[in-house]
Design a protein with these regions (language model features):
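Solvent-exposed soluble domains appended to multi-pass membrane proteins
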Residues: 7, 11, 15, 22-181
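A solvent-exposed beta-alpha-beta segment
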Residues: 4
């Protein structure tokens, strides 16, 4: 259940000495605007950052979101490039009787700039899932100031097929293209 999943996340955070902990896309088990975010923030050590993905709800819209949480602040980045038929139904007005997506009907594209600063003034480009394949969407003057790229994803649904491996290698290619680890 979701409470047990959150307890496991909190336990991992509490027991870790790492400065940055990165969890998968949609790993946060509740809607992000839920007060349970405080439970994560309260268990973060000083100079520690947790990066985790989840679903955010705001003004009747759902967003696939990356959270950057430290002891004093929570930043978020909403996915800008959504997966057709997975995160939204193209031509919904014509196909409104088709229910392909479990959960919210459609996610909404994010509008926030792509750069997050960690506590130690290091900056990274947040990327969610398959956004990494659209290199021209990452070519933003703002991103040239980034120190590295973080791509959170949940490729478990691919199983043992090629998808996760292709995703991993595309991420490596982007890092080389942008000269970022």
């Amino acid at each position: 259940n979701n409470s047990k999943k959150l307890d496991n996340i909190i336990e991992l955070i509490s027991n870790s000495e790492s400065e940055i902990l990165i969890f998968a896309e949609n790993n946060y088990p509740f809607l992000i605007n839920d007060l349970k975010l405080e439970a994560i923030q309260n268990n973060i050590k000083n100079k520690q950052t947790v990066i985790i993905g989840g679903t955010r709800f705001n003004k009747n819209n759902y967003f696939n979101t990356l959270l950057n949480i430290n002891k004093s602040k929570i930043n978020y980045f909403d996915k800008k490039i959504l997966v057709p038929f997975g995160e939204f139904l193209p031509l919904r007005n014509y196909l409104k009787n088709i229910e392909l997506i479990s959960g919210p009907n459609d996610y909404t594209e994010g509008k926030i700039d792509r750069l997050i600063t960690l506590q130690n003034k290091i900056r990274y480009i947040p990327v969610i899932c398959y956004e990494i394949i659209f290199y021209w969407k990452l070519l933003d003057k703002l991103n040239y100031d980034a120190n590295f790229i973080i791509n959170i994803t949940n490729d478990i649904w691919f199983g043992k097929f090629l998808g996760p491996y292709q995703h991993f290698y595309l991420t490596k290619i982007r890092a080389v293209e942008f000269n970022k680890p």
